C-alpha cells in the first residue's frame, strides 16, 4: 500500500484535520463504549505533541443529513477527550467557513452528517473541508469503504492527504490475516445485518477453512434447514442462498437456541431445540450445546476473523452464546482479528480486549476489505501519493 503516512510528516505549526471514527454508542449524554475513541487517541496525541493546530471530526449515528440534532452531537466525545487528555477541548459547530486553532490545541468539529452533501461526497463541501487544513489525515478505517465528503472528497482536494497511524495499522493487520493466514482459519460472521453479510460469507467460504454463523444470519440458515423460525429476524428471500452455501461449505448451524415471545431486555429466555420453535417465538441467542461446539472449533484455529455477536448479548438473558464464543476466541492461541461496532461492545463487556490479537475499528469496511473490495478513501490516498 503506497500512501503518504502521517508519521513521515512534520506537522509543527500546520493546520491538521483528522477524520477519525468516533462513532460510539452514547446513552444519556455519556459514551458507553469507548473502544473507537481509545483507538484514535494516539493519532490525536501525536499531532498535538508535534505542535500542530489539530482539528478532529467524525460522524456519529444516523441523523437527518443537513440538520443539527443534539442527540447526535459529538459533545459526549468532547467531554470524554477533555477527561482523557486532561486539557481543554473545544467543540466547533459552525466551522465550514474557517475555524481558529492554536498550535497544540484540539478542536472537535461537529458531526459531519449535520452538513448537507456529506454522504453524497459533494465537491463543494469537500473543498470546504480541504480549505480548513494544510494536512488531511484519514484515520477512520471504519468509514474507508464509503466515498463521502469527509473521507474521500476532502482527500482529493487537501494540499496533503495522508493515512493516520491507525488506518495504516488496520490495513497491515488485515492484510497479514488475509494474504497468508495460518491454517486452519475460522471466520465468524454474526450480528443482525443479514443481507449485507451473506455476500461476505461467499467470499469467506473461499479463504476460510471453517465458517461460523450467528445472530440473524444463523436464523436464515436455521430456516434454510426447513425449521420454523417464528418471529425471528431472518431474510426469507435469502434462504435459497443459505441453502447453496450449506451445500458448498461446512457451516455448523445451531441445533439449540434461546427464544422469547418479545424482544425485550426483561424477556425470560427459553432454551429449546431448533425443531421446537413456535410461531410466536423469536430466536435471540444460540443454545449452550451449539455455542460449546463452536468453542471447540475455535480452540483448534490458527487464524480467527470475528465480525458480529452470535446473539442479543445486550440483553442479560441472551448473552451466554456470545460470551462462550468470545471467551473461546480469547483463550485461543490463534492470531485473532475482531471488527465491527457490536463486536467491540461485546469485547468490552467481557473484558477480553488484551486477549484479541488485533481489534479493527471497522464494521462495513472490515467486511469489504475481507471481500477484496477497493475502499474508496484508501484508493484516493494512494492516488494522492503518486502526485
Swiss-Prot record:
Compartments it resides in: Cytoplasm
EC top class named in words: transferase
Chief location bin: cytoplasm
SUPFAM superfamilies, A to Z: Phosphoglycerate kinase (SSF53748)
InterPro entries: Phosphoglycerate_kinase (IPR001576), Phosphoglycerate_kinase_CS (IPR015911), Phosphoglycerate_kinase_N (IPR015824), Phosphoglycerate_kinase_sf (IPR036043)
Residues annotated as binding ATP: 197, 314, 340-343
Pathway: Carbohydrate degradation; glycolysis; pyruvate from D-glyceraldehyde 3-phosphate: step 2/5
Upper lineage: Bacteria, Pseudomonadati, Pseudomonadota, Gammaproteobacteria, Enterobacterales
Protein name: Phosphoglycerate kinase
Entry-linked PROSITE patterns: PGLYCERATE_KINASE
